[in-house]
């Protein structure tokens, strides 16, 4: 972006020194100059869109922040005691949990919890809601069938988080990210700018005091 700006500045100087340049040419160059700087300013303020984080449960891929509940319903999943036509309301009282948190099951087997969020309005039918958060179940055996960004969770150990970078563990390469670590919690935040324009993603890993896994989670945050 800086190189584009420098190029435009040099072009303006060169053309203004030439008395034979048409006014329309100068106007075009001036417009290009302003456009490039407005673009750079917007990118500085809002950042760049990050790649969404996929979660795979058995043979089903869920794009957190994009996949609708109807897609999982079609593949045999259920959400708590709710049906496809049930009303889901987003109370907008929490920065992390949007809509309603419900247990997700398939063939009477729990696969954790998901937040279902209406889009464009405060209340909508469950089938129209977007999945904005996923948390793995407490049953460690279920991790064999779950992956985050195509990384099998059953293969991960606490030692991995103590010795490796989170972006390497989950095989992501974001341009903008932040890491928060304690003895038991490891959080990778992708897109640290305000999430008014672009979605922010968080991959969360929580361990018990004995080093065993408590849960993994993926969430998408978005104000619009």
Describe every region a protein language model picked out.
Residues 11-14, 20-29, 153, 157, ...:
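Low-complexity, repetitive regions of proteins mediating host interaction that are extracellular
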Residues 36-42, 127-142:
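Short, structured interface segments
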Residues 44-54, 83-84, 179-181:
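Long, compositionally biased, intrinsically disordered segments
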Residues 48-63, 142-157:
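Terminal, regulation- and interaction-focused segments at domain boundaries
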């Amino acid at each position: 972006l800086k190189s584009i700006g420098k190029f435009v500045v040099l072009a303006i100087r060169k053309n203004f020194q030439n008395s034979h340049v048409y006014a329309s040419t100068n106007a075009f160059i001036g417009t290009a100059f302003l456009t490039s700087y407005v673009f750079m300013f917007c990118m500085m303020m809002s950042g760049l869109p990050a790649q969404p984080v996929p979660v795979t449960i058995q043979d089903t891929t869920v794009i957190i922040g994009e996949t609708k509940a109807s897609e999982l319903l079609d593949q045999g999943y259920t959400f708590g005691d709710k049906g496809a036509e049930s009303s889901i309301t987003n109370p907008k009282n929490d920065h992390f949990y949007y809509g309603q948190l419900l247990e997700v099951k398939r063939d009477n087997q729990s696969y954790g919890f998901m937040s279902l969020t209406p889009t464009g309005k405060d209340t909508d039918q469950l089938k129209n809601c977007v999945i904005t958060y996923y948390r793995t179940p407490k049953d460690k055996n279920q991790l064999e069938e779950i992956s985050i960004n195509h990384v099998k969770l059953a293969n991960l150990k606490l030692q991995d988080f103590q010795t490796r970078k989170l972006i390497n563990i989950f095989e992501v390469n974001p341009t903008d990210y932040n890491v928060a670590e304690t003895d038991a919690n490891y959080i990778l935040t992708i897109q640290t700018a305000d999430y008014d324009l672009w979605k922010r993603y968080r991959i969360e890993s929580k361990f018990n005091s004995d080093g065993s896994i408590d849960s993994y989670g993926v969430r998408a945050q978005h104000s619009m």
